[in-house]
Amino acid sequence: HKDVMRGRRDRLGELWVPIGSSAMFDPQVLLDMAYNGMFVIQCYGATETCGAGIINFAQDEKHIGAVGQGSELMDYKIEPDGELCMRGDCVMMGYYKDPEGTAEVIDKDGWVHTGDLAWVDEDGYYYITGRKKNLIILDSGENVSPEELEGMLEKCPVVQECIVKELGKKIGVVVYCEKEHQ
């Protein structure tokens, strides 16, 4: 992204279709790449669904941060706690010789509980906000997604890397800055 924004897209060679999956990306980064001639694709899937899931080809500002719209091959729902669930013919039969593990992930109605937190907009685009198991539950009862906080912190130009973790019902942050700002 930095090379693209500094006008050095040529350093990326023939790369013109960056594909992102398995992580949340800053929508502004994706939009910057799209505005600079790249066709950005985001994908979402799971091993338990044989890779089938959601894909986003949208290049517009409103939807570029989404993982996409659902496929006709799958059913999707978001649980009251925000967890994304998927169901369809491509869902695995279960984990090999692990019925307990299978029961934790696939419910009696065939829904795969992904463990990912998401929301869907009025146009049917899904947005991943974090992992259910990573939620920090504060003393006030508020649920905080560390991934969302990390995304906000990483927008600061001097921040190279950061980690947000729970420290006794409070939010703990480790920030690594550029050397000259340490």
Language-model regions: role of each:
Residues 78, 88, 93-94, 117-182:
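AMP-binding/adenylate-forming catalytic core of the ANL superfamily
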